[in-house]
Amino acid sequence: MVADEEVRVRAEAWNNAFGYIKPTAVATAVELGLPDILENHDGPMSLLELSAATDCPAEPLHRLMRFLVFHGIFKKTAKPPLSNEAVYYARTALSRLFTRDELGDFMLLQTGPLSQHPAGLTASSLRTGKPQFIRSVNGEDSWTDPVNGYHMKVFSDAMAAHARETTAAIVRYCPAAFEGIGTVVDVGGRHGVALEKLVAAFPWVRGISFDLPEIVAKAPPRPGIEFVGGSFFESVPKGDLVLLMWILHDWSDESCIEIMKKCKEAIPTSGKVMIVDAIVDEDGEGDDFAGARLSLDLIMMAVLARGKERTYREWEYLLREAGFTKFVVKNINTVEFVIEAYP
């Protein structure tokens, strides 16, 4: 028994040593278009078919697919009648989530040069509070550089993928939150992807996407949505519901309180602020997303020294300091929770 445990622990150590390979392999599959190809194909595909569809040689593609099948991203299936090829591959429920309509673009951001988290999470960064990867990759603050087209497109596409995923969960699990709401202001709403889904689901809602002027200036027109430029440290457009989706985890407690106060000023006494962010449970027993939330917290520490994921008690403190009298937490069965805060 002791020997078996020693083997298990040693295997776990090796798996941790090579742990970065799995997300890299998934991102490579996304870049090749494999999840979309198999999702849109009528039935399984052979290695040669996938090779032709991706313009990738069969031998390295076989090795990539072997790894991804082992980890449950794709699956092998029986060959069709009259086929000369031994192995066929099929999509899975997991691979569907890595299509470009789902989280594929978000995966590319997390593994690309714009988000070199492993390089940022170092002993030095913990001791000094200064993320190392920012200087090593581009020498500038992560919000201002890189500004070249490719990296910013990767970032924008990833944020849009996250907005689609999370907004779908909000629509599914919190429809009552939008009853009687006339105007929703999405603070940090970028190009209005989240608002577009909300307006489609709740057609009585008018949307305002509020972000930096240089961001909203590039937003495409969307029915039912107005784009307003500005800074949430100065003021927030008036609305019945102010949405803060994945915004506050970027900021220190002091900045969060300041932002939340501005949002509170923008709503009537009958309004609310909807915060969509992770709530960290340090035990996390029985919670499928607990590990992802803890990982996200380390990512924030690596990328932004001021950023963090917060516990229930930490959120309670921020809301109280910002002047909210009560709040309700709702589980939407994803990495984030919905916190409805009332003045």
Swiss-Prot record:
GO terms for biological process: methylation. It catalyses: apigenin + S-adenosyl-L-methionine = acacetin + S-adenosyl-L-homocysteine + H(+); kaempferol + S-adenosyl-L-methionine = kaempferide + S-adenosyl-L-homocysteine + H(+); isorhamnetin + S-adenosyl-L-methionine = 3',4'-O-dimethylquercetin + S-adenosyl-L-homocysteine + 2 H(+); scutellarein + S-adenosyl-L-methionine = scutellarein 4'-methyl ether + S-adenosyl-L-homocysteine + H(+). S-adenosyl-L-methionine binds at residue 211. Keywords: Methyltransferase, S-adenosyl-L-methionine, Transferase. Pathway: Flavonoid metabolism. It is an enzyme of class 2 (transferase). GO terms for molecular function: O-methyltransferase activity; protein dimerization activity. Its EC number is 2.1.1.-, 2.1.1.75, 2.1.1.155. It comes from the Eukaryota. The active site is at 249 (proton acceptor). Flavonoid 4'-O-methyltransferase involved in the biosynthesis of polymethoxylated flavonoids natural products such as pebrellin, aroma compounds which contribute to the flavor of peppermint, and exhibit pharmacological activities such as anti-allergic, anti-oxidant, antibacterial, anti-proliferative, and anti-inflammatory effects. Homodimer. Belongs to the class I-like SAM-binding methyltransferase superfamily. Cation-independent O-methyltransferase family. This is Flavonoid 4'-O-methyltransferase 4. The lineage of its organism: Eukaryota, Viridiplantae, Streptophyta, Embryophyta, Tracheophyta. The gene is OMT4.
